UniProtKB/Swiss-Prot annotation:
Organism: Rattus norvegicus
Gene from which this protein is expressed: Kcne1
List of glycosylated residues: N5, N26
Major place of residence: membrane
Any single Pfam family the record assigns to this protein: ISK_Channel
Biological role stated in the UniProt entry: Ancillary protein that functions as a regulatory subunit of the voltage-gated potassium (Kv) channel complex composed of pore-forming and potassium-conducting alpha subunits and of regulatory beta subunits. KCNE1 beta subunit modulates the gating kinetics and enhances stability of the channel complex. Alters the gating of the delayed rectifier Kv channel containing KCNB1 alpha subunit. Associates with KCNQ1/KVLQT1 alpha subunit to form the slowly activating delayed rectifier cardiac potassium (IKs) channel responsible for ventricular muscle action potential repolarization.
Summary of subunit composition and partner proteins: Interacts with KCNB1. Interacts with KCNC2. Associates with KCNH2/HERG. Interacts with KCNQ1; targets the complex KCNQ1-KCNE1 to the membrane raft.
Posttranslational mods: Phosphorylation inhibits the potassium current.
Membrane topology, as annotated: Single-pass type I membrane protein
GO terms, molecular function: delayed rectifier potassium channel activity; potassium channel regulator activity; protein-containing complex binding; telethonin binding; transmembrane transporter binding; voltage-gated potassium channel activity
Protein's recorded name: Potassium voltage-gated channel subfamily E member 1
Family, per entry: Belongs to the potassium channel KCNE family.
Biological process annotations from GO: cardiac muscle cell action potential involved in contraction; cellular response to acidic pH; cellular response to cAMP; cellular response to light stimulus; epithelial cell maturation; heart contraction; male gonad development; membrane repolarization
Length: 130
């Protein structure tokens, strides 16, 4: 891989600088060039404002269409009526309670017969290591 030489740009920049900054050059040409640059900068600012305006208009349109699509447009729609009613919430509560009862039925307790038969005996405990 060949390394690029960054010093090759310096003579080009020096010659460009000498062309733009000629001592004793024509002042009227400089003034005409500067006035044209000012006019171009006004057009550049106008172009930037136009691009930003189009971008803002486009963004606003997308935002408004998104907000409009999220509104409940068809209130007579059976699905929306069902969601607004509390019937599905009551059914959900009943289903949840049934599932909880099923899970309790599936659980069972293993009983230690020695502890039940001799409750007075001392059971060993773990002591904290503090």
């Amino acid at each position: 891989m060949a390394l690029s030489n960054s010093t090759t740009v310096l003579p080009f920049l020096a010659s460009l600088w000498q062309e733009t900054d000629e001592p004793g050059g024509n002042m009227s040409a400089d003034l005409a060039r500067r006035s044209q640059l000012r006019d171009d900068s006004k057009l550049e600012a106008l172009y930037i404002l136009m691009v930003l305006g189009f971008f803002g208009f486009f963004t606003l349109g997308i935002m408004l269409s998104y907000i409009r699509s999220k509104k409940l447009e068809h209130s007579h729609d059976p699905f929306n009526v069902y969601i607004e009613s509390d019937a599905w919430q009551e059914k959900g509560k009943a289903l949840f309670q049934a599932r909880v009862l099923e899970s309790f039925r599936a659980c069972y307790v293993i009983e230690n017969q020695a502890a039940v038969e001799q409750p007075a005996t001392h059971l060993p405990e773990l002591k904290p290591l503090s």
